[in-house]
């Protein structure tokens, strides 16, 4: 009789323990901040007490987004998805990733996880040596609007990394239909150079290597701020800087709060166009652009030009500006591959 009572007690305790262990959590339980970005504004990573699963929140992941929030829940240790959760679900760490932007590749490379990439968009334009070395085994799924979903499905991805331009990616609905989880990466929207790089921490979380990602990122602000201080202590003066070339009859000038304007300031320069304090580039006419260029000490990011002769051919009127005459014209295309892929738009995100 005592043995039967003891057995019944053991069974009851076992059932009670199992019930507590498997009790479904609620999404509001995931309020423990695991990583709060210091420089980026578009994401955070949260957990819950006693849970190994995490919740990644991505805010306003495309231009013009207002109060848009997306979520990725990463299930770990056999835990359940919270009741009523309507976001994306990744079961375990991502081992097979399709990266739709070259910056995603650079971030995964920076944390030592580039070999998780099994699919890309536009492989010919990618600079990363590991991707090019494995190009025969990596699927090029094409570009948004013309995605090869049959190939994408055959890659058996755990996760697809997306980006939005002026709205949600057109891939969303098809990926949901195929039951392939996705996550938006909004690095390009960050105005801080360090904020862009900090998105590598998000990618380290989806691969189960957040500690590694935090360590890799931590070295970047140290190096960046040391260079910034060195420039600030310099007595070489503050050159005024003109940007870009015309697009049709307009010349687009970035905001003073933009990524490139901040790079200029941190490098000891003065961005010449101070009128645009908004959050997007604005067009000016060619006459105003000429007046700005005439006052500039340097001219950066001159489109497809590889030489002063190229620039002269595309902008003949601007050849009498001081920066042109002095040869103080610089482009960002020193590392361009044979297909025209520019590493500035790839690895520069993790090397500000």
Language model segments and positions:
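Flexible, glycine-rich surface segments
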Residues: 229-316
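Extracytoplasmic/secreted envelope proteins and their assembly/folding machinery
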Residues: 91-94, 102-108, 149, 169-172, ...
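Bacterial Sec-exported substrate-binding components of ABC uptake systems
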Residues: 20-105, 212-241
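A short, structured surface patch at a secondary-structure boundary
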Residues: 54-57, 62-153, 159-165
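Extracytoplasmic ligand-binding site segments that recognize negatively charged/polar headgroups
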Residues: 104, 120-128, 168-170, 186-202, ...
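Bacterial Sec-dependent N-terminal signal peptides
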Residues: 1-26
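Soluble non-cytosolic domains of exported or imported proteins
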Residues: 142-147, 165-169, 190-197, 210-214, ...
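Structured C-terminal subdomain patch of bacterial secreted/periplasmic proteins
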Residues: 190-215, 301-352
């Amino acid at each position: 009789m005592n043995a039967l009572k003891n057995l019944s007690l053991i069974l009851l305790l076992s059932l009670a323990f199992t019930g507590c262990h498997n009790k479904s959590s609620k999404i509001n339980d995931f309020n423990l901040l695991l990583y709060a970005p210091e420089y980026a504004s578009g994401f955070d990573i949260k957990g819950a007490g006693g849970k190994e699963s995490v919740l990644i929140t991505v805010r306003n992941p495309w231009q013009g987004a207002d109060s848009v929030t997306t979520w990725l829940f990463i299930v770990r240790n056999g835990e359940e998805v919270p009741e009523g959760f309507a976001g994306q679900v990744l079961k375990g760490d991502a081992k097979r990733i399709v990266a739709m932007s070259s910056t995603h590749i650079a971030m995964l490379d920076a944390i030592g996880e580039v070999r998780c990439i099994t699919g890309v968009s536009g492989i010919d334009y990618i600079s990363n040596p590991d991707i090019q070395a494995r190009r025969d085994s990596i699927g090029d799924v094409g570009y948004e609007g013309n995605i090869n979903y049959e190939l994408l499905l055959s890659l058996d991805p755990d996760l697809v990394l997306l980006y939005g331009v002026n709205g949600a990616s057109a891939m969303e609905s098809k990926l949901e239909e195929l039951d392939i989880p996705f996550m938006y990466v909004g690095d390009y929207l960050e105005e801080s150079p360090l904020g862009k790089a900090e998105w590598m921490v998000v990618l380290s979380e989806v691969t189960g290597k957040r500690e590694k990602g935090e360590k890799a990122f931590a070295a970047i602000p140290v190096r960046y701020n040391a260079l910034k201080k060195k420039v600030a202590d310099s007595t070489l003066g503050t050159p005024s800087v003109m940007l870009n070339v015309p697009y049709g009859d307009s010349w687009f000038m970035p905001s003073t709060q933009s990524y490139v304007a901040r790079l200029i300031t941190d490098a000891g320069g003065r961005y010449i166009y101070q009128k645009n304090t908004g959050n997007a580039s604005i067009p000016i006419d060619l006459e105003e652009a000429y007046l700005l260029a005439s006052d500039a000490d340097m001219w950066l990011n001159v489109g497809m030009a590889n030489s002063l002769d190229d620039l002269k051919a595309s902008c003949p009127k601007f050849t009498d500006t001081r920066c042109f005459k002095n040869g103080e014209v610089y482009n960002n295309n020193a590392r361009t591959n044979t297909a025209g892929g520019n590493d500035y738009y790839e690895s520069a995100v993790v090397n500000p």
